[in-house]
Amino acid sequence: MPLSAGAAKTLRALRAEARERLSQASIRNAAQEVDWLLCHASGFSAAALLAHQDSPLDEEAQERFELELRRRESGEPIQYILGSAPFRDLELKVGPGVLVPRPETELLVDLALSLLPDDGFVFMDWGTGSGCIAASILLERPRAFGLLAERNPQALSCAWRNLRCLGLLGRALLVHSRTPGDLPVDAECDLVVSNPPYIPTGAIDGLMRDVRDFEPRMALDGGADGMDCYRALFEAAPLWLRPGGILLLEMGDAHQAELLKGHSDRFDFLRGVLDFSAITRCMAWRYRG
């Protein structure tokens, strides 16, 4: 139900009511998310929010807060409502149609940086989404050049905005690519990196509501066995990689990792990295040429 009507409420009262509503909506991090929404609606910093708990929130800000709270109650990702998501030390723009960056994908960036030289190189990020992987690599390697490919126009536009805000457009080319095999440009890369859709089609309905009902299905659905994009990437990567170049992929579970480890005789497996749950989350191969 909406926040109770009447005179302007104090921040303390608003926080208490909103936390109860999000808890009833099965939002796991209700207390923290209410504070994020209050800061977003009011313009207060987190410190100011605490310092002014007994002050009323003006009517306009309270209306904004109510609208945003309803969106979160419906299951819409908090990142879409706030308009941004953290990734490594960045705060990236996100919104409907764009996969929300995950902490696990930071491991993919760490592995890429550990395998690449400090001097100039060219890489491709297929399925770039918000551009989180490419932006992180470009910031860490000032002489690198990135080719960002994405099949979702909304996500490609979001990646462009993020790179523009970070001053990285001069070292990047963004292209629309429906599949790994139809890239509309020629490239010879030192690295191909991807966090592709890898969830089996039949498992989509079992995902959390904020993922299942709001995030783009094309960024999640990996086909009947979750492996469609992996097969396409292994097939297409030799078109882009120089001999000795690296293919770097994120995967969803240990079963996929085991299937992928020796997937192609054109690549030599290098190593994998475990995530916070001790599951192999990303793996690297070297292209034989």
Predicted segments with their positions:
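General small-molecule cofactor/ligand-binding pocket signal
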Residues: K93, L173-V175, L270-V273
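Short helix-capping segments at alpha-helix termini
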Residues: S26-I27, R141-R143, R164-L169, W240, ...
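Conserved AdoMet
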Residues: P2, W36-S114
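Residue-level signal for inorganic ion chemistry
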Residues: L37, G75, T105, I133, ...
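Non-catalytic accessory regions of SAM-dependent methyltransferases
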Residues: M1-S42, A47-L49, L57
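Mobile active-site "lid"/loop adjacent to the S-adenosyl-L-methionine
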Residues: Y198-C229
